[in-house]
């Protein structure tokens, strides 16, 4: 059936048909760089990173543009508070954003333009709107005339009358309509400015995204994304000014991710109930955060809490333990031929594992083709993991069939890992990393754990099972779980 995406513009799932066959052009609104990013920003960027990765996985040629808003009232206000220039603020937080995105494991977009590097394009677009009588000068400002654009508010499904009746808008007598918005702002004394036909000033918020997206992607492109909070006014205004200027449809598919909530309230700086990406990644592995953010459908709200992150951590640990068992089986089967699986030689359990492994890519693809349903995609991964655990636990030794199956499992999971940006660490490394993080929260030192395990090993050799059991119980009381195998005793944290 092909890929179907939910288009905010139509309110329906639609078949995805790119403007140019074999190519995808997508633009995602980046951050205003005046402060550290919170995990609401993490969600938007992880969501569109996975969408970007999935298009690449499908073999499409993707141009992905994500901007920086590096001039804005918030940036200027912070610069004034700190007594520095605006560009020092923006450059500082661009670096912080880039560091956060790197820690989250995001692929770099094709292009990351800055508003301040596209002033000429912005001025040209504003002038076009004036020439076409969609914009007017008001002192040193230039405003967009919303009443001139017949389909204004078509993205959010509102009306000007409803907006005006329910709005608390400061009256500006220079505006022809209270909902008119700024394309160009006259510079106040002491503010950064650029020369323009309307005097010294700077861009409004919305115009920069239209100018930059159309420069790199053309007048009509495939996908524009962002958080639901951007539907109005930002994306609504982008549509108005872009389509007024070109007379063509601006974007074919509008995608919006849901909010991250705390206690059923949207997480945001303005509400003061936010956690920065850095704060969360200092406490949890980056893959755990990605796993958590992808555990719900991207359009649904997701509730952030330590409990939910701990549950995500436990889920990811289960998957990695299964992958570790696959690695251990392959390591134990040094003499395996590595030949392709001979389905006719498999027993019933092996046959079930073969079927689930060979179908995982198709099931994963079906989930992703249904509006990038990562929650369902994850469910298919867990289904495979349960089968892996059952079959490997019931299998004695590493037969050629089992080794061939494990090789196949590794290859299939690697494909999924490339799309989701998780499961890509070496299993042993991830589990050790996770154990170290958990151990940091214990009230017993790692050295003491290792000492007690060594003492228990000696007690077992001496057949002092009473002491052996005492040590196991002592460690269990500290949330330490012991696992005995032919290779020795390993431990993990509950």
Swiss-Prot record:
Gene3D superfamilies: Cysteine-tRNA ligase, C-terminal anti-codon recognition domain, HUPs. One of its GO terms (molecular function) is cysteine-tRNA ligase activity. Its cofactor is Zn(2+). Zn(2+) binds at residues 29, 209, 234, 238. Coiled coil: none annotated. This is Cysteine--tRNA ligase. InterPro entries: Cys-tRNA-ligase (IPR015803), Cys-tRNA-synt_Ia_DALR (IPR015273), Cys-tRNA/MSH_ligase (IPR024909), CysS_C (IPR056411), Rossmann-like_a/b/a_fold (IPR014729), tRNA-synt_1_cat_dom (IPR032678), tRNAsynth_Ia_anticodon-bd (IPR009080). The gene is cysS. GO terms for biological process: cysteinyl-tRNA aminoacylation. It is found in: Cytoplasm. The keyword Nucleus does not apply. It comes from Geotalea daltonii (strain DSM 22248 / JCM 15807 / FRC-32) (Geobacter daltonii). It holds the Pfam family CysS_C. GO terms for cellular component: cytosol.
């Amino acid at each position: 059936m092909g890929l179907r995406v939910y288009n905010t513009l139509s309110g329906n799932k639609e078949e995805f048909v790119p403007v140019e066959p074999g190519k995808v052009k997508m633009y995602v609104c980046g951050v205003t760089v005046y402060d550290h990013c919170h995990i609401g920003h993490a969600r938007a960027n992880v969501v569109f990173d996975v969408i970007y990765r999935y298009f690449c996985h499908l073999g499409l040629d993707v141009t992905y543009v994500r901007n920086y808003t590096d001039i804005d009232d918030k940036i200027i206000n912070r610069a004034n508070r700190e007594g520095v220039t605006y560009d020092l603020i923006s450059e500082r937080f661009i670096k912080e954003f880039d560091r956060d995105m790197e820690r989250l494991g995001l692929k770099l977009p094709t292009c990351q333009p800055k508003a301040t590097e596209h002033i000429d394009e912005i001025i040209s677009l504003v002038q076009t709107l004036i020439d076409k009588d969609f914009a007017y000068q008001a002192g040193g400002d230039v405003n967009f005339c919303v009443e001139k654009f017949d389909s204004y508010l078509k993205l959010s499904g509102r009306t000007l009358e409803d907006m005006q009746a329910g709005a608390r808008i400061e009256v500006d007598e220079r505006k022809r309509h209270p909902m008119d918005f700024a394309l160009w702002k006259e510079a106040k004394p002491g503010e950064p400015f650029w020369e323009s036909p309307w005097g010294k000033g700077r861009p409004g918020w919305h115009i920069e995204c239209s100018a930059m997206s159309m420069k790199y992607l053309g007048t009509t492109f495939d996908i524009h994304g962002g958080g639901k909070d951007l539907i109005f006014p930002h994306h609504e205004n982008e549509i108005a000014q872009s389509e007024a200027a070109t007379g063509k449809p601006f974007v074919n598919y509008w995608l919006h991710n849901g909010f991250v909530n705390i206690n059923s309230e949207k997480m945001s700086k303005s509400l003061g109930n936010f956690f920065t990406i850095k704060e969360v990644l200092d406490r949890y592995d980056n893959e755990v955060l990605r796993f958590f953010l992808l555990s719900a459908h991207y359009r649904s709200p997701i509730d952030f809490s330590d409990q939910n992150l701990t549950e995500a951590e436990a889920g990811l640990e289960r998957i990695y333990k299964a992958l570790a068992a696959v690695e251990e089986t392959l390591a134990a089967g040094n003499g395996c031929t590595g030949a392709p699986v001979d389905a006719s030689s498999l027993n019933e359990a092996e046959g079930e594992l073969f079927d689930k492994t060979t179908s995982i890519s198709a099931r994963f693809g079906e989930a992703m083709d249904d509006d990038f349903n990562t929650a369902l995609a994850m469910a298919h991964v867990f289904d495979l993991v349960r089968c892996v655990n059952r079959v490997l636990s019931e299998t004695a030794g590493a037969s050629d069939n089992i080794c061939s199956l494990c090789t196949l499992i590794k290859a299939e999971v690697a494909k999924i890992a490339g799309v989701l940006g998780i499961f890509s660490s070496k299993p042993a490394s991830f589990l050790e990393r996770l154990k170290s993080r958990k151990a940091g929260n214990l009230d017993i030192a790692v050295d003491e754990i290792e000492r007690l395990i060594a003492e228990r090993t000696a007690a077992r050799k001496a057949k002092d099972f009473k002491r052996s059991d005492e040590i196991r119980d002592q460690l269990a009381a500290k949330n330490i779980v012991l696992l005995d195998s032919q290779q020795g005793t390993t431990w993990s944290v509950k």
